[in-house]
Swiss-Prot record:
Protein name stated in the entry: Protein NrdI
Biological-process GO terms, alphabetical: protein modification process
Domain of life: Bacteria
Family: Belongs to the NrdI family.
GO molecular function: FMN binding
Function: Probably involved in ribonucleotide reductase function.
Length: 140
């Protein structure tokens, strides 16, 4: 299973480089088309007010990528990265993409992940490659 990922500070890129999975980086300058199943790994940059939470503009490339030529139709699941110190907006972008496209949020980790996180994502990818089924549950 291929990983499609977006990295702002390099944390997500460092995580992906620790896996043995094929991958492609989402950048603001590309129109990247996916024609095979993939897992999306996205960090979260969001703002929160008393009435609304939303991803900030720096995350637009993730939303653009998912919409481009219906890439979202090939996405088998979403993995969120973030910092738990941000409490209510921890992995918010992953939750927002999951809800928008009704794609399961499958896993989350902090910063650039631990060896256990790498193993868990590789196992998850292998299970999906072997036909494991997952169901959507709205994370918001």
């Amino acid at each position: 299973m291929k990983l499609a990922y977006f990295s702002v500070t390099g944390q997500t890129r460092r995580f992906v480089s620790k896996t043995d999975l094929p991958n492609v980086e989402i950048t603001p300058d590309d129109d990247l088309e996916m024609d095979e199943p993939f897992l999306l790994i996205t960090p979260s940059y969001a703002e929160e007010s008393p009435t609304v939470s939303k991803s900030i503009d720096v995350m637009d490339p993730v939303f653009d990528f998912m919409a481009y030529n219906d890439n979202y139709k090939h996405c088998r699941g979403i993995i969120g990265t973030g910092n738990r110190n941000f409490a209510g907006i921890y992995i918010f972008t992953a939750k927002e993409v999951s809800a928008k496209y009704q794609i399961p949020l499958l896993y989350d980790f902090e910063f650039n992940g631990t060896p256990a996180d790498v193993a868990a994502v590789e196992k998850l990818a292998a299970q999906l490659d072997q036909g494991a089924k997952v169901t959507f549950k709205n994370p918001l």
